[in-house]
Structures are given as C-alpha cells and as structure tokens.
Amino acid sequence: MRCIVSYKSLRSCLVNVPELLLESISEPVQNYAVQAVVCKNDIKKTFYFGISGIPSQFSFEIDSTYAHTLKLAENQEINLSIIDCTHEIEQLEIEPVTSNDWEIAERNAAWLEENLLVQYRVATTERFIIYLPSGTFIQFQPLKLIPSSLCGRLLRTTEVLITPKPNTSAIEVKENRKVNLRCVVENRLLPDSVTADSPALCVFLPLNFPDRPDVVYMDGGNLKSTIVCQCVSCPFQIPGHFFISKSLALSYSIKTGFKFQIWKAHNPPSSSKFILEQKGLPPESNLSSELVAAKLKNSYLMDGMTLKLVDIAVSYSVSGLSGVVKNPIQDIKITSDTNVPVNAGIRNNSPRLSMQPFPHEFAQVRNAVFLHQNIYINGPKGCGKSNLVHSLFDYYSLNSIYFQMIVSCSEIDRSSFAKFQSFWNNVFIQAERYEPSIIYLDDVHCLISSSNENGELGFVEEREIAFLQHQIINLKRKRKIIFIGFGEEFLTFSENLVLPLLFQIKIALPSLAVTRRKEILTTIFQENFSDITMDSIEFISVKTEGYLMTDLVLFVKRLLSEAFVEKIQNGPKHLMNKGLIEKTLKDFVPLQLRKAKFVKSSIRWIDIAGMQEAKEAVRDIIESPVKYSLIYKQCRLRLPTGILLFGYPGCGKTYLASAISSTFPVQFISIKGPELLDKYIGKSEQGVRDLFSRAQMAKPCVLFFDEFDSVAPRRGQDSTGVTDRVVNQILTQMDGAESLDGVYIVAATTRPDMIDPALLRPGRLDKLIFCDLPNEEERLEVLQKLANRFHIENAAMLKKLSTLTDGYTYADLSSLLYDAHLIAVHKLLKRVSINAVDPSQTTSSFTNLTTESKRNASMLALPPESRYNQNMQSMSDSKSVVIEDYMLMEALKKNSPSLNSEEFEHLSNLYRDFRSKLFEPELNARNTDVGSKTRQI
C-alpha cells in the first residue's frame, strides 16, 4: 500500500498505519510489524516498525524526532505492508549514541527497564530513541541481535544489555573523588564467579569505578561513621548501583536501597589483632572458632562494631585497633559472654513454610510488579497471606534491586489525624528516598473498614483515606514505588469504592485443593522430622477439606503431640496409626469454624416415619456423594446440590432436615429466613456471602433454609428492594462462576408459589419434593415410632387411631399422644396425693403388709418433702406412666386436624397448580425427548 509520511508527536517508536491495513490483522498488533520500503535515487531501503494499533488518516504517521533519526522526510512516498513478526529476540545489545545519552540512561536505568517495551517493540539494526517522562530522549544504536535477524519481536523475557559509553575526559578525576551509589545487598544478580572467593566483609564495585581500588571508604546511609571495606571488582554492572556482601549488610544493618558515598582509600589501616566476644550461644556450643576466623580473612574490622556472619546464628562484639585480618588464626581471639541470652532471631507467630502454597498467585504478583501496578491480595485469616508476604520479600531480596518495607496497618496509631499523617509521611519518605521500592501493607482492611453499623465511613476515616489515596497516586505517577496490600475481602460499598483507587489488581487466595494440601502436609512433616507414611499423608489430605494453611500446621502439631503422649504411654510402635489420625481429626476444629454455629440434632434417621420419597432423595443427593466422594469426582456430570421440601404445615419438613446432622457425616447450618435480612444496603448480601463462605470452609456442609419463602420471595414485590438483592446474591452463590463443591442446600416452605422462579430452575434447587399428609399406613408408622417413647397399655389401639385420624399431620399425631400422656400424668398425680397420708395418723405396726402397703409405709417414714421428691422422681420416667385406651380416645376427642377443610382445599389447589405449571412442560418433553432431565415431585 502506497502512502506518504506524516509527522506526529507520538513520543514513541511505534507508528500509526491506515485503517485498511489494520483490518487485515486478525491477532493482537504485538505479533505484527510494518515493513516500509523507501525508494530514493533508485536505491531501496527497508525499515521495520512496531504498530501502535491506532489508525491514521491515509498516511504513515511517525514521531518527528524518530523520523529525523532515520532520515525520513515528511510527505515522502513509501510502500507499506504488514508482516508476521514471529522471530523472537532472546538478547539485544545496544549502545548509547553519545556519552550524554549514557549518563541519562544511567540515571534512569530502572525506568528504562520497566518502560522500554512500551515505546520500542520491534528491534532492527537501525538507530532508535526512547522518550523519558521529563521530555528528554535517549538515542540508542543496536549492536547485536541474538538470534541474528533483520527484525525481531522483543518480549518481556528478552535480555537487554546496554554497553557503557562513559565520558573519557570525566573519568580522569581527582584522587579523592566521592562517588554516590545505591547499594544492593548481595543476591543472585551477582555471578557466582565473583562471590566465590570474596571476603566475608566487602563491597562489589563496577569496573568503571575510578581507579578500580582494592580498599574503599564508605559513608552515608545509616552509618554513624565512615567505615573501610575490601573492594572486589564486578563485571556485572547496574548503572548507579554497587553490591555489598551479606555479612557486611548484617553487621551494619544495611538494606537494599541505602545510598552511600564511596571513595578510594589511599592509606587503609594495616593489619591488627582483634578480640571477638561471642554473643547468642552458651559456652558449650560446638561452634568452631577456627571456622569463624577463616571467614574473616582479608576483611576489615572496626573497633566497637557488632559482627554478624551469614549462616552463623551468633553475633560478636569486636574490640581492637581497626584494620585488616591477614592471618585469622593469629589475629583473632574469640571469647564467650555467658550473660547474654541466646539470640532466637526474629520471632514470627505466623506459620511459614519452605514451599510456596500459591504458585499461580505468586506468579500473578510478579507480573503485576513487572507492570508497576499496585496489588491487593485478600483471603481469610490463616489462609497463608503472611507466608506469601515472606515469600515475595525473599524473592525480591534475592532477585532484584528493590528496597522493601513491611507495614502493619492494624498497629498504626489512629488516635489523631496528625499521628496518622506523621506515620505515613515517614513511610513515604523512606520509600521515595530508597526507590525503587516495594511497600507491603499488611491488614489493609483495618484502614478502610468502617466501625459504623451501616458500613459507611466517618469524617475522620474519609479524611485518612483521602490522604492515603492522594499520596499513593502521586507516588505512583512520579516515583517507582509499588504497594502490595494484604487483608480480608472488602465487602461494603465504601470499601469497594476505595479499593480500585489504591490497588489496580485484586488477587483472591483460593482454597487449598487436595494435591496442594498433600504437598503442604508433606513439607510440614519433613520439617518436623516425623516418620509418617505417604498413605497417611494422603488420608489426612482427603479428610482436611476446607482447611487453611494455618489449620494444617496446627493440626500437624496437635497430631505430633498426641503421638508423643502415646509413645510415652504405649511405646514407640505404630505412632502414626490411622486410629490416632482419625481421633485427632475428630477433636480438631479449624480456625474458620471455631466461631461458626453448627447444629447437632438428637433426632435420628430411624425416628422419621413415612416420607420415604423425601428420605431417598436426601440420601441420593447428600449421603452418597459425601460417602463415595472419590467415585463421584470422576463423574463429569454436574450433580444436584439443592432440595426444596414443600407441603402442608406440620408434615415433617423441618423434622426431616434436622435429622441430617446426626445421620450423615456433614456439618449442618440452620438459617431462619428473616435473620438474613438487614435494613442497611449491602448488609443482607454480605450476610449471604458470609454464610456460603462459612459453608464452603466447613464442607461437606448442609445449609438449611427454613421458611424459604420469607427470604427469597418473587423479585419486584418488595418496595425496599432488600429481598430482591438477597435473591440475586443467593442465585449468584448457588449457580454462579464458583461452583458449590461440597455444599448442599435444603430449603423448606409451605408456600412454594411465593419463591422466586429462578431459584427453582435446574442448577439451583434441583429436587422439588412434595411432603403430603400421611396416609393410614404412614400414620400407623408415626404412632408406633412415637409410642416407643411412652408406655402404651394396648399397642393394638394404635391401629384404630390410625384409621380415626384421617387428615392429621405428623405434628397433629405427635400432639395427640402427648395429650394422652398428659392425661395419664394427671391421673397419677391424683393417686399420689391420695396415698400421701399425714404421718400423725399412722400406726407403728408394719407386720403382714402387702407390697403396696410396704411401699406406702416406707414413704411414711420419710419427711414430707422427701416423700414428694421421691414421688416426682418415680414419675420422671415417661414409661412409668401408663397410657390406657380411654386416655387415647379422650385425647382424640380433644384434638382435631390443624388444617381445616378450607385451608386444606386452598393449599391443595395451590400445590396442584404449582406442580402442574412447573412440571408439565418437562413431562411433555420427557415423552418426546429421550434423556431429558426429570425432577422429583
């Protein structure tokens, strides 16, 4: 395509091409390049450019400065074509055109590292420019492309090497010139060949350092006075930086990012003898003095310094004239200080693993840091956030030049805005002084969460958040500072409003899968030197569904303690047997479940009479998937997880649901409908989210919604909109992007027609079970189950009652027997009062008494209060009270069905219409389509 060159202030090496060319691209523009052929004086020259993706007006738009660099004139005709830029550059070596360009590049090395690909995407052998935020630009000349090619695509993994081009006249400096450099504590960026034979206390300076000294003075940073250090020349260069050995950094508490003045030491201190007073270990420590002394060869020691060496958990107080250690055996004498307690190091209550339990999220954070974006990582307490913080801190300490700081937001003094502002100003000053910086904000939710009941921020809180927002946004624009926040999920409206302003990326830590739990448990047991079989670890990983990382650590500690106790009591054989593991699992309660209220009912499954269809459905949906979870996981079909029990009042819906907790190996959470509703916006939805989150943590778990029609009515009928939002949230939780793995929903209602129809569709409440009035056989079974609790004189009377109680519900039958029992109790009380004769009227003759008289005589020998208590104790057993036939008939006369004919007819018509509307289309489809989904009525 022929077009003309048009100048435009693009401030980039990317170009704009006509829309006609862009339409021919089917993939992202990053995968393509523009080939521009220029013909001048019968000489053709080809250029290659990266595409910006912005269409132009029938012209080839290019930055004017970049065009002058390539000698492309405005309005010059060129031929354009789109080519597939599949060639990837692994290494690009470039050189600044002038020494001024080198100085600018050296001062802005960190910015270039992050933003080079934004302006220069397709590498060629032609000169190019990079614009800086200040408005200046740097010219570079490519020297080498590996693999060699006319053009290639730059990736984030491409290694870019900048060859220094120093000003030769400026290198000829005075002897005592001080050079300002930013320090980096020794890490993996340094080649092993440089650090292998280096002294324990030294600095690594670039090759272009003036005079390449062997010994240097260093001042600034956090040093109280000038120190002298051994110098090692390092071919690996980061402009404006130097490396410092780990031992030297530990001894003087130096961190990456501190800035120092360094100059050549013309008259360094000579060799000297030193006394090292050992601190941190008792005298019987087997730490070799010769080993410590050997590490200090060719190192400079200062009088009064505190010496700390890598891999040695002890510190030394140095005394002697400042100088270098030439002969360690002769020059160093080590003594012990028994008055100093053992140095246990930094205590951290959070469990920390040597492995990374969240590799995917760890990679996400690394990518976000590469893009210079703020990140917020959320998860419940104990899920592994602290472990991730330390993993990130260790990673960037070993692989970057970032200054790092951890801020605990929960410990900030917020008694006044002045103190709050002063604290953060100090943090921001350090981050700005030592940039590039990464600031870890722990417990961020403590800053943004509101203490008000309605979730709204107060005036002081809004002022604090506005201050933080202003400072963080300004620092992000002007400085290379990255904020990584950790905390719990933001749920309220005000929190979600503030979150995107402070953090661009939000990462939620997921629950631990079985394989991940197995890896974590293996690591924990290995770190505790426990001999446990892999079969036992796999068994524990399967049984710890919903456990957080902290739960796993605490569980292993509990298990090891139980094993130790068993070892003392029963000997060392079979310490980690399955019985011990199961016992520990049964007694252990995860952190997230310690505040949860789980229901354990005394109702047994065998106590439920009738309702065979409902009981079979509950077993199919809940018991089988839980009991045979490994088999069901291999099934790719989506299993039903919801049951709706609907029917007449008193027909056993709640009774059946209550028996689940005592029958199946699941946790049971019961929710009364109205308790989820709240007058404040967002609170009801938050309650629903918390409820499902608790259930997910406790899985396998059953959520039982009683009176479901009150919490999930048809949308559009509530003037306040509260129930509409609750229904929307329940729909999202039940059948949203995140599946309810291991969480089962059981709902009960008398009015299914009032429930929102969306909740009754497949994928939500899959099984709709009608709980009808019991028939004669079911009534007899109910009466027989209830009769086991009482003493019925004539069991055959129950058959007669079952025929006389047509229209009775399960609750009515239970009330009938309880009324009969109450009649029997009243009769017994009357008999007891008659037998309680006054003691003054009794005789002393107790000979030839009948059995009943003997009992009465023994009662009369007791005080009146004792006689009454013993009578009541004999009546406390329900089976000691005999229910006779006439009592049952008398109770039947007093009772009547709780549903009168009008209510029964109304509900019957309602259930008939509900079932016909809901199921007739499916029944018709089932007659024509084989394999259609069926639903249970």
From Swiss-Prot:
Name the Enzyme Commission number(s) assigned to this protein: 3.6.4.-
Q: Which UniProt keywords apply?
A: ATP-binding, Cytoplasm, Hydrolase, Membrane, Nucleotide-binding, Peroxisome, Peroxisome biogenesis, Protein transport, Repeat, Transport
Name of this protein: Peroxisomal ATPase pex1
Q: Which family does it belong to?
A: Belongs to the AAA ATPase family.
Return one GO MF term.
ATP hydrolysis activity
- State the gene name recorded for this protein: pex1
Query: SUPFAM superfamilies in the record, alphabetically?
Result: Cdc48 domain 2-like, P-loop containing nucleoside triphosphate hydrolases
Main role? Component of the pex1-pex6 AAA ATPase complex, a protein dislocase complex that mediates the ATP-dependent extraction of the pex5 receptor from peroxisomal membranes, an essential step for pex5 recycling. Specifically recognizes pex5 monoubiquitinated at 'Cys-6', and pulls it out of the peroxisome lumen through the pex2-pex10-pex12 retrotranslocation channel. Extraction by the pex1-pex6 AAA ATPase complex is accompanied by unfolding of the TPR repeats and release of bound cargo from pex5.
